[in-house]
Amino acid sequence: MRSWSAPDIVPLPGTGGPLRVHDTATGRIRTTTPGPRAGMYACGITPYDAAHLGHAFTYLTFDLVNRVWRDAGHDVNYVQNTTDIDDPLLERAEATGVDWRDLAHREIDVFREDMAALRIIPPTSYVGVVESVDLISDLAARIRDTGAAYELDGDLYFSVAEAPEFGEISNLDRGQMLELFGERGGDPQRTGKKDPLDWLLWRAERPGEPAWDSPLGRGRPGWHIECSAIALDRLGPAFDLNGGGSDLIFPHHEMGAAETRCATGGPNAHNHLHVGMVGLDGEKMSKSLGNLVFVSKLRQQGVDPAVIRLAMLAHHYRAPWEWTDAELPAATARAERWRSALALGAAPDAAPVLAAVRAALSEDLDSPAALAAVDAWADTALTEGGADTGAPALVRATVDTLLGVRL
């Protein structure tokens, strides 16, 4: 599946330092240690509606990881999926009288446009579930053959009893797991399961639903194994960083990690990064609640994508936050102030700004601190001036390359 057009990256003098990020599994900030090529997987959208700011905030976060790694001299193998077959997609297609394939294609196109406008570096591999059904079913069969899965009325379930490390990502107790599993797409009440926490690997064909031939019979994949199979295929086991929104910690990432351990004997990733939820009207933005601010709608209203990006960068990726009417005016004012400073013929030395932005982003992607460093330079430039004629160009390149904001 094609991704979207890549932004050009302006080279910076020197190189950045190693990236440290908060690892969900250990609860600690850890130094990432990729080799020459870093490997990263981010869970993608289910394309039954346009991308909202919660999605954009997640992919902005992984874009910062990508930029910091590149600045430190690493090539980056970035893989992102799109869940182009799933129950919510089928339900929306039926409710609106649209073929599910057409709905998915339409919303994926809008997503691509949004990501390109926000200057998100595209994945090395942008992979749909539909195009990956064979490798997903093969992984499910591989897990079945280890004895870790069982059949129930033609469906294939992973037996949580066969995953001794289960809980290593989320660190939740069983009661919390059961509650979240039921809220987030699981079926803990299904009769016949060995354990309420057992999860679906392969769903046997149902009348009126799409299905594919496989070694497991005709059907379609369960949710969690889709990402496990795509990540294993494109990144191999034990890659550098796996993640997504914090609502994916459990069950999605916990169950995916168990599937990979079962199939390979090791972890799926060395680090697990999760992004705080963006709220509106006191609730997290979600398609099911309908309390959404769409990136595409903001663009249609004439909002500069650089301003949208700056509004999100003002928030640390791990902290939940609320979108309010004050976000865009504040980001617009910041962009105008920066542009005014960048238009000066000379300004204060920019080398400390580059160093400060690098240091902030390398330490758990502290984008608010990075913005503050540029703010301080711009304020000094506008009030006191400066003598360095090359400073505006270096700050412009710093903001462009590390923060992804083109002014």
From Swiss-Prot:
Catalytic activity: 1D-myo-inositol 2-amino-2-deoxy-alpha-D-glucopyranoside + L-cysteine + ATP = 1D-myo-inositol 2-(L-cysteinylamino)-2-deoxy-alpha-D-glucopyranoside + AMP + diphosphate + H(+)
Quaternary structure annotation from Swiss-Prot or TrEMBL: Monomer.
PANTHER family: CYSTEINE--TRNA LIGASE, CYTOPLASMIC, CYSTEINYL-TRNA SYNTHETASE
Organism: Nocardiopsis dassonvillei (strain ATCC 23218 / DSM 43111 / CIP 107115 / JCM 7437 / KCTC 9190 / NBRC 14626 / NCTC 10488 / NRRL B-5397 / IMRU 509) (Actinomadura dassonvillei)
The protein's name in its UniProt record: L-cysteine:1D-myo-inositol 2-amino-2-deoxy-alpha-D-glucopyranoside ligase
Keyword Membrane annotated: no
Protein keywords: ATP-binding, Ligase, Metal-binding, Nucleotide-binding, Zinc
Family: Belongs to the class-I aminoacyl-tRNA synthetase family. MshC subfamily.
